[in-house]
Regions:
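Phosphate-end processing signature that detects enzymes handling 5′-triphosphorylated RNA
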Residues: 2, 12-15, 22-207
């Protein structure tokens, strides 16, 4: 379960309970994109907890009475599939394992097999807060990114695209792992607190 506190309008290697599968990089784009914007920036705090499936269902039933369900939930939540990038020596992974105060994750995220675009995202840990920036890219450009070809980012006018290109190109980022799971989300009516349940987690050990 993840509880987040957003200041404006989430997993990489957090997969201790993940079941390893054989999803290949090309299969990554057999993926639902929520209503997307071209660039979105969010500052928030996150608190994460492990729980059993029984506990999840019990708490979910309680939240049904006091919070709003995400419009995309459906009967069993919605699917999320993310391809994570890292340097050759897995610097971002090691920074997380070492618990560094300043660290980042770069990922390509898609929610729907029929989607014609994906979200390129960078999450940066800054003390107790996280900053997440997202850029909408076309399906064709997303495929190029899965092949380690980043020049397609140069066609986007936003400085975030240029930042990602420079970082991923100069520091030799490569596709590293795919994480897929189902998410059920709740939103508080009174404020911007969001509670999500992630389950049925699967991941590749390496791309």
């Amino acid at each position: 379960m993840t509880q987040s506190y957003e200041s404006t309008a989430e997993s990489c290697y957090d997969c201790q309970a993940a079941k390893m599968t054989g999803i290949s990089v090309p299969d990554f784009l057999q993926l639902f994109v929520l209503e997307g914007c071209y660039l979105n920036e969010v500052y928030r705090q996150e608190k994460k907890y492990f729980m059993t499936l029984f506990e999840m269902k019990k708490l979910s039933g309680q939240l049904d009475r006091v919070m709003l369900q995400d419009a995309h939930n459906g009967a069993n939540g919605y699917n999320i599939r993310s391809l994570y990038f890292d340097t050759i020596n897995e610097r971002d992974y090691e920074a997380k394992i070492d618990g560094l105060e300043l660290r980042r994750k770069i990922r390509l995220r898609i929610y729907d097999p029929a989607a014609d675009f994906a979200m390129l995202e960078m999450k940066q840990k800054e003390g107790s807060y996280q900053k997440k920036r997202s850029l909408r890219v076309s399906r064709e450009d997303a495929i190029e990114l899965t092949k380690g070809r980043y020049h397609s980012l140069l066609k986007y006018a936003d400085p975030f695209a240029a930042e990602c290109y420079g970082l991923m190109h100069m520091e030799c980022y490569r596709p590293k792992t795919i994480v897929e799971y189902k998410r059920k989300a709740y939103i508080a009516k009174e404020n911007k607190i969001r509670i999500t349940f992630d389950h049925q987690i699967q991941a590749t050990e390496s791309c």
